[in-house]
């Protein structure tokens, strides 16, 4: 896996977690 893909996946994961928390706790 290239560093670019890894970073994109990490950012996407963090955004997904933030989105999940917002949806779950609101």
Swiss-Prot record:
Signal peptide span: none
EC number: 4.1.1.39
Removed propeptide positions: 1-2
GO MF terms, alphabetically ordered: monooxygenase activity; ribulose-bisphosphate carboxylase activity
Enzyme category, top tier: lyase
N-acetylproline modified-residue sites: 3
Main location: plastid
GO cellular component, one term: chloroplast
Subcellular localization(s) per the UniProt record: Plastid, Chloroplast
Keywords: Acetylation, Calvin cycle, Carbon dioxide fixation, Chloroplast, Lyase, Monooxygenase, Oxidoreductase, Photorespiration, Photosynthesis, Plastid
Subunit structure: Heterohexadecamer of 8 large chains and 8 small chains.
Family in the record: Belongs to the RuBisCO large chain family. Type I subfamily.
Note: The basic functional RuBisCO is composed of a large chain homodimer in a 'head-to-tail' conformation. In form I RuBisCO this homodimer is arranged in a barrel-like tetramer with the small subunits forming a tetrameric 'cap' on each end of the 'barrel'.
Name of the protein described by the UniProt record: Ribulose bisphosphate carboxylase large chain
Lineage: Eukaryota, Viridiplantae, Streptophyta, Embryophyta, Tracheophyta
Gene, per the UniProt record: rbcL
